[in-house]
A protein has these predicted regions:
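Sec-dependent N-terminal signal peptides
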Residues: 3-12
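Bacterial Sec-pathway N-terminal export signals of envelope proteins
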Residues: 15-58, 160-169, 198-242, 307, ...
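Acidic, low-complexity, intrinsically disordered peripheral segments
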Residues: 22, 31, 202, 373-397
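A small-residue-enriched
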Residues: 26-87, 223-287, 390
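Amphipathic alpha-helical coiled-coil segments
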Residues: 35-38, 45, 99, 106, ...
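Sec/SRP-type N-terminal targeting helices
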Residues: 36-40, 53, 86-114, 164, ...
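Alpha-helical hairpins and coiled-coil heptad-repeat segments
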Residues: 149-166, 342-360
Length: 397
């Protein structure tokens, strides 16, 4: 029977795989519906741009009438012709360029969603790693306490400890167990979030490495150009207004040509016509240029305000990370001293009967509270760290 169980365990282990953070991100990106949706929308807007700026179809026109001359037989007179509008210069190309630049700016803004998704997934990965570690430590702590409880149970049989003391230990054991169950549930939920958003199959046979979590740093460095996507989008929108100014600066941007054949009773006539819009009789082009200039100014002011707010939030995040990193150092030192020095003394004093069970339990709870505070501070640090990377619109280093 033991050999069968061992064989089954070996088969399960052989099918177990471990994913790193990079592999998880690759899995998410390769199966991302967000990326696919943006690609389809990109094709849609480009097709619509070409459709909206394509030349108008050639027009066929004609008419017919029954002629009743005073002399001769009745005949049918008719007229048929073709007309076509032609854009002059680069009018059509400029209109396409205006739309294309605005579309490109829009998709640069949409790329932030992908960056936000990636950073959100990184944050979930780190949360799971913290939850998993916290669960393992809490489980070990619970198991150690169970050993102590069993030891005291034996001591109670020999009347070395009181019934009240044993009951207090039992209450603490039950509390730790309930606490452990809650921590385990949080860890399971945390893992499910990562696997669902990361598009990872075989959750039961796949584990996460957690050896590649980011170090806690007081000063987070952001190399390269910050807010690059926003800057590029703003540049493209400004460029579109410049193209619009050029587009509406011409006094003549299109003409219409026509050819017509007239068949009358005793006359065949072929005519060619041209239609030229008299733009000087309308202020449309002038208003279009004014609109482009106003749009350029508005974009500049909006971008300046947006960058000001982003820089302010960036400073806020970096200050927050710095304070959390410093706090973690203090908490770890306190917990280390408490665990290595004070708690062993309390435990020894309790074993010798010099300290009450309540005092011993209170000191254990204090150690747990310090560990819990470290765990919560780390979570807050990583959540803010990836908000910082998302805000800066760049890859972290």
């Amino acid at each position: 029977m033991k050999h069968i169980i061992l064989f089954v365990l070996m088969i399960q282990l052989s099918h177990t795989s471990t994913l790193t953070l990079k592999q998880m991100l690759d899995s998410a990106n390769n199966n991302s519906t967000l990326t696919q949706a943006l690609e389809q929308e990109r094709l849609l807007l480009e097709a619509r741009n070409l459709a909206d700026t394509s030349s108008d179809p050639m027009e066929l026109f004609g008419s017919a009438a029954n002629a009743n001359p005073l002399v001769g037989e009745d005949e049918i007179e008719y007229s048929v012709g073709l007309s076509q509008q032609f854009s002059l210069g680069n009018t059509r190309e400029e209109e396409q360029s205006i739309n294309r630049l605005n579309n490109e700016a829009y998709f640069l803004e949409e790329d932030k969603k992908i960056l936000n998704f990636e950073n959100g997934l990184k944050s979930l990965y780190h949360n799971y790693c913290l939850d998993n570690k916290y669960y393992n430590v809490s489980k070990q702590n619970y198991q150690q306490f169970v050993k102590l409880y069993k030891k005291k149970q034996k001591a109670y049989k020999y009347q070395e400890v009181s019934k009240a003391e044993l009951m207090q230990l039992e209450i603490e054991k039950n509390r730790l167990y309930a606490q452990l169950q809650e921590i385990e549930m949080n860890q399971v939920i945390s893992k499910q979030k990562v696997f669902v958003l990361g598009r990872i199959n075989n959750a039961h046979t796949t584990t996460l490495s957690c050896k590649d979590i980011y170090p806690i740093r007081e000063n987070v460095k952001l190399d390269g150009d910050r807010f690059q996507l926003s800057q590029e989008a703003h540049t493209k929108r400004l460029k579109s207004t410049q193209v619009a100014l050029e587009r509406h600066s011409r006094s003549l941007d299109s003409i219409s040509l026509s050819a017509q054949y007239d068949k009358e009773i005793d006359i065949d006539r072929v005519g060619i016509g041209i239609s030229i819009p008299l733009n000087f009789t309308s202020n449309r082009s002038e208003q279009e240029r004014a609109a482009a200039m106003y749009e350029s100014s508005a974009l500049g002011f909006q971008h300046e305000q947006t960058m000001l707010e982003k820089r302010s939030r960036l400073m806020e995040y970096r200050s927050y990370l710095n304070s959390k990193a410093r706090m973690l150092k203090t908490l770890k030192n306190n917990h280390r001293n408490y665990k290595k020095q004070l708690l062993p003394l309390i435990k020894k004093s309790y074993d010798l009967g010099e300290t009450s069970v309540i005092e011993y339990l209170l000191n254990r709870q204090k150690s747990y509270q310090l560990r819990q505070e470290i765990y919560a501070t780390k979570k807050a640090y990583y959540n803010t760290l990836f908000k910082l990377y998302a805000l800066s619109e760049m890859k972290d280093k």
